[in-house]
Amino acid sequence: MNIGKFKYIKKPSWFGDEGPIYEHEGLNEVLRVLFDQNTNDVKQMSVWETSFPPGVGIPLHKHPYPVEELLYVLRGQGMETVGDEQREVGPGSAVFIPPEVEHRIVNTGDEMLVLLVVVSPPGIVEKDLFQKKVKKATQVWEKDYF
């Protein structure tokens, strides 16, 4: 009896604890994807947790496409720059980054800075982009990738 070929269909997870974890070696950043198009079939946003050791952060950048970004500090202390504003952030701080506005964050404390990040529309956490960043983290930032 011929029943045809089987095709693997990944069932999306409704829980955010099954996503991939990426480490940007050149930045010492660890990023854990919680929800995105590839992990959970989330269509309107990407959500991840990212952490930086003391003295480390994301350089000043802006995204080359319209995207809204929300940051929520879970642990640690940092300095966030959005446009021409700069502010110290800590647990419970929430930051909105409008589309096409330069921004950066640096861990200014003595423990890990841990953030919950929400991006809409999704796309910045797409698998191929992060694989590129992971493989070439140092070169990516030197070339002002964002």
Each language-model region and where it sits:
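Short acidic-glycine-tyrosine-enriched beta hairpin
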Residues: D84-P99
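A short, N-terminal "cap"/entry segment at the start of jelly-roll beta-barrel domains
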Residues: M1-Q44, F130-F146
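Conserved short histidine dyad/triad with adjacent acidic residue
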Residues: L31-D36, W48-P64
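Short, conserved beta-strand element in jelly-roll/cupin
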Residues: E49-P53, H63-V82, V118-S120
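A generic "binding-loop/recognition-motif" signal
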Residues: P66, E85, V101-E102, E111, ...
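A short hydrophobic beta-strand segment most commonly corresponding to one strand
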Residues: S46-T50, F96, E111-E126
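Short beta-strand His + acidic residue motifs that chelate non-heme Fe in jelly-roll/DSBH
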Residues: L60, E80-T81, I97, H103-D110, ...
